[in-house]
Swiss-Prot record:
Region (Disordered): 623-648, 740-834
Example of a GO cellular component annotation carried by this entry: sperm individualization complex
Family per similarity comment: Belongs to the TRAFAC class dynamin-like GTPase superfamily. Dynamin/Fzo/YdjA family.
Gene Ontology biological process terms in this record: adherens junction maintenance; border follicle cell migration; bulk synaptic vesicle endocytosis; cellularization; chemical synaptic transmission; clathrin-dependent endocytosis; clathrin-dependent endocytosis involved in vitellogenesis; clathrin-dependent synaptic vesicle endocytosis
Start and end residues of each stretch annotated as G1 motif: 33-40
Broad class of the protein's primary localization: cytoplasm
Gene that encodes it: shi
One Pfam short name: Dynamin_N
Name listed for the protein in its UniProt record: Dynamin
Length: 877
């Protein structure tokens, strides 16, 4: 049985010494009580030595985890001083004081950091106890004003655990109903399953009082009962009275005291030590299955985390080489999966992957950037008009000059360089993010990660430069030759016949299909109408609708997209909103939404706004183009030219440019993503798979590159310690035989027959610190002296006859509830009690019924026998 306590001590030491916090509540006994209640004295009596600090005020200022182990030699060990044995218990006391002051200071401060002390002695039973600070009311020294609450919280930190037994220490010379220890225990253990009562200072009670009712578990009963002890007095301590002599004096006190001699074998420090040993052993046995389950769960969690650490040896070069190869292979698979996409088991459902973001750049952002660079209709016609007139010069042209078409188209094609270069920059930026994410698993080796990122980034930058050259070369190809014989080109004949309401550049007939859904905020709603708030928007090729939420059941409004354009909204410096805003508006100035000229929409980030703009672009809503203002009357006169032949030529060139630019932009949107994929992304993937490892070996010393970071080494050691401690703990617990015999927990205390509040004068036992009732005058019998006079009442049951078989109290007269109450109080009180004997009230004697008189005679006779036996026993002892 004691091996169970030893096991828990080993677990406690293993976890504490390794610095492992396993979230396991190991079975222990916490000693709780008020200040100067005698807690430390009880612990010293267990050990048989003076080793705990003493003094006035609060002395125990840190929890002391005391492990008592039965051994051949007598010495102590502290967990914070490993390997040092303290043979002198005076040195142990000094070390406790010094260690307390190191953490809390020397001016009565407190701390919840425990001190672990293990005491080996042939005079102790295996126990694990926690000495906690005593409850105090007033702060002294540098203690905070809420010292009482802090101490309570510290105590609750230990006793609220279901695996902790509570040793509630209460002095006998105080009222048990006001016991701080029992009050705290009641809060966390209302059923009393874990609480053991200890009554100290029994020898200091007032003369004529005793704690028999408490020790017999009749006053404020506990499920595990009370045990009384007698500690050394302050005079004994100052006189260096040996604890063994004190234990002998304690035994003599209980054997000689008339109120305690009948239960002397169930009182005293040795009995308390045996009870605690048995109770703790049983408690450990009951909690071991749950402890094993927690350890197994911890083990399963730790096994996944330490799988890569199990066979790791920091000094082994082969293991480092293997680790490098494994991480490069992991990088290759992660990079490819991020770019190409992953299977259903590994797909990320929280955010877009790098490949998905690059896809959005190709098909949304590039299209949007190209359209932003295009001129609007009015600007384009003005440029065509200038080109035609400048080509003709002083001559009057009879035919539409094709050189004007070529000049305008080249200007439009040259504008494509900026958006395609920006597309390359966006892809490279996203690719750098992907590389950083994929190398995150190399964080254990910061130099390796840094070198890997440097090599890959350098290669990507080189490919970026090459890709930009090739893409600009594609634009130069378009500038070098105008293929007016293209099958999709409209031609001069069709251009002249085309109406001026021809399709605008880049438009597509999509039908009324849904293009995008998502949340946006309408910014320009008035305060009286609810202010800005988020809505669920549905964008189609013909309209945009918004709903209250994504269920799309309550539609707020539907806005047609015909003739609308986009513009950015700049937030003023007084604006409190940090959201990015854009607006839908009509170029002709009509109201767009109710009384509003524009509908202002906002998103959280710039990326979201740009994505929405690209979606609007697919629906045919283009960004606003700022018109350049010309100065002078010449510009006004040029723009107001009304030459019908020039207007026809402008319209023809306009249709030709529109048709040819559709071909060029279509080719550009198709070829740019292909060039980026081949020259950057696929090349980077091939580089990582085929050349990265060689560059790493050539870059420097692999031993330095594979040095662990301090954080990773600390975490690895901690994880391995936790894993080994958990594994050892499971092995220790697994070796325990669960066939041990334990005493069952006592049944719950039944006191429902007691009157509420114990206020009945016949049944109410006195408090330990109170004075028992003084004897009243002898009652006169109405039978003329047939019966002997009643003895004065002592207010308690009669003393027991020594060495009676069973050690219990004498048989009680029948008729009492449960047969376990003390005899009724004799008629010495002027209280109006009825049916007890002859009661004197207002000078008149009243007779007692015959049946009750017989019971009184029987009790009196038994009391006389007991007193005679006690006197005889003490005389010839």
């Amino acid at each position: 049985m004691d091996s169970l306590i030893t096991i828990v001590n080993k677990l406690q030491d293993a976890f504490t010494s390794l610095g492992v916090h396993m979230q396991l509540d190991l079975p222990q006994i916490a000693v709780v009580g008020g200040q100067s209640a005698g807690k430390s004295s009880v612990l010293e009596n267990f050990v048989g030595k003076d080793f705990l600090p003493r003094g006035s005020g609060i002395v125990t200022r840190r929890p002391l985890i005391l492990q008592l182990i039965n051994g051949v030699t007598e010495y102590g060990e502290f967990l914070h001083i490993k390997g040092k044995k303290f043979s002198s218990f005076d040195e142990i006391r000094k070390e406790i004081e010094d260690e307390t002051d190191r953490v809390t200071g020397s001016n009565k401060g407190i701390s919840n950091i425990p001190i672990n002390l293990r005491v080996y002695s042939p005079h102790v039973l295996n126990l694990t106890l926690i000495d906690l600070p005593g409850l105090t009311k007033v702060a002294i020294g540098d203690q905070p004003v809420d010292i009482e609450q802090q101490i309570k919280q510290m105590i609750f930190q230990f006793i609220r655990k279901e695996t902790c037994l509570i040793l509630a220490v209460t002095p006998a010379n105080t009222d048990l109903a006001n016991s701080d220890a029992l009050k705290l225990a009641k809060e966390v253990d209302p059923q009393g399953v874990r609480t053991i009562g200890v009554i100290t200072k029994l020898d200091l009670m007032d003369e004529g009082t005793d704690a028999r009712d408490i020790l017999e578990n009749k006053l404020l009963p506990l499920r595990r009962g009370y045990i009384g002890v007698v500690n050394r007095s302050q005079k004994d301590i100052e006189g260096r009275k040996d604890i063994h002599q004190a234990l002998a004096a304690e035994r003599k006190f209980f054997l000689s005291h008339p109120s305690y001699r009948h239960m002397a074998d169930r009182l005293g420090t040795p009995y308390l030590q045996r009870v605690l040993n048995q109770q703790l052993t049983n408690h450990i046995r009951d909690t071991l299955p749950g402890l094993r389950d927690k350890l197994q769960k911890q083990m399963l969690t730790l096994e996944k985390e330490v799988e890569e650490f199990k066979h790791f040896q920091p000094g082994d070069a082969s293991i480092k080489t293997k680790a490098m190869l494994q991480m490069i292979q992991q990088l290759q698979s992660d990079f490819e999966r991020t770019i190409e996409g992953s299977g259903s088991a590994l797909v990320n459902t929280n955010e877009l992957s790098g490949g998905a973001k690059i896809n959005r750049i190709f098909h949304e952002r590039l299209r949007f950037e190209i359209v932003k660079m295009a001129c609007d209709e009015k600007e384009l016609r003005r440029e065509i008009s200038f080109a035609i007139r400048n080509i003709h010069g002083i001559r009057v042209g009879l035919f539409t000059p094709d050189m004007a078409f070529e000049a305008i188209v080249k200007r439009q094609i040259a504008l494509l360089k900026e958006p395609v270069i920006k597309c390359v920059d966006l892809v490279v930026q996203e690719l750098s993010v992907v590389v950083r994410m994929c190398t995150a698993k190399m964080s254990r080796y910061p130099r390796l990660r840094e070198e890997t990122e440097r090599i890959i980034t350098t290669h990507v930058r080189q490919r970026e430069h090459s890709c930009k050259e090739q893409i600009l070369l594609l634009i130069d190809f378009e500038l070098a030759y105008m293929n007016t014989n293209h099958e999709d080109f409209i031609g001069f004949a069709n251009a002249q016949n085309k109406s001026e309401n021809a399709n605008k550049t880049g438009t597509r007939q999509l039908g009324n299909q849904v293009i995008r859904k998502g949340h946006m905020v309408i910014q320009n709603l008035g305060i009286m109408k609810g202010g800005s708030r988020p809505y669920w928007f549905v964008l189609t090729s013909e309209s945009i609708s918004w709903y209250k939420d994504e269920d799309e059941k309550e539609k707020k409004f539907m806005l047609p997209l015909d003739g609308l354009k986009l513009r950015d909204i700049e937030q003023g410096f007084m604006s409190m909103s940090r959201r990015v805003t854009f607006a839908l508006f009509s170029p002709d100035g009509r109201n767009v939404y109710k009384d509003y000229k524009q509908l202002e929409l906002s998103c959280e980030t710039v990326e979201d706004v740009e994505s929405w703009k690209a979606s609007f672009l697919r629906a045919g809503v283009y960004p606003e183009k700022q018109e350049t203002q010309e100065n002078g009357d010449e510009s006004a006169s040029e723009e107001s030219s009304s030459d019908p032949q020039l207007e026809r030529q402008v319209e023809t060139i306009r249709n030709l440019v529109d048709s040819y630019m559709k071909i060029v932009t279509k080719t550009t949107r198709d070829m740019v993503p292909k060039a980026i994929m081949m020259l950057i992304i696929n090349n980077a993937k091939d580089f990582i798979n085929g050349e990265l490892l060689a560059h790493l070996y050539a870059s420097g010393d692999q031993a330095q590159m594979m040095e662990e970071s301090a954080e990773s080494a600390t975490r690895r050691e901690e994880m391995l310690r936790m894993y080994r401690a958990c594994k050892d703990a499971l092995q220790i617990i697994g070796d325990v035989s669960m066939a041990t015999v334990s005493s069952p927990l006592p049944p719950p205390v039944k006191n429902d027959w007691l009157p509420s509040g114990l206020d009945n004068p016949r049944l109410s036992p006195p408090s330990p610190g109170g004075v028992r009732g003084k004897p009243g005058p002898p009652a006169q019998s109405s039978l003329g002296g047939r019966n002997p006079p009643l003895p004065p009442s002592t207010g308690r049951p009669a003393p027991a006859i020594p060495n009676r078989p069973g050690g219990g109290a004498p048989p009680l007269p029948g008729g009492r509830p449960g047969g376990s109450l003390p005899p009724p109080m004799l008629p010495s009180r002027v209280s109006g009690a009825v049916g007890g004997a002859i009661v004197q009230q207002s000078g008149a004697n009243r007779y007692v019924p015959e049946s009750m008189r017989g019971q009184v005679n029987q009790a009196v006779g038994q009391a006389a026998i007991n007193e005679l036996s006690n006197a005889f026993s003490s005389r010839f002892k």
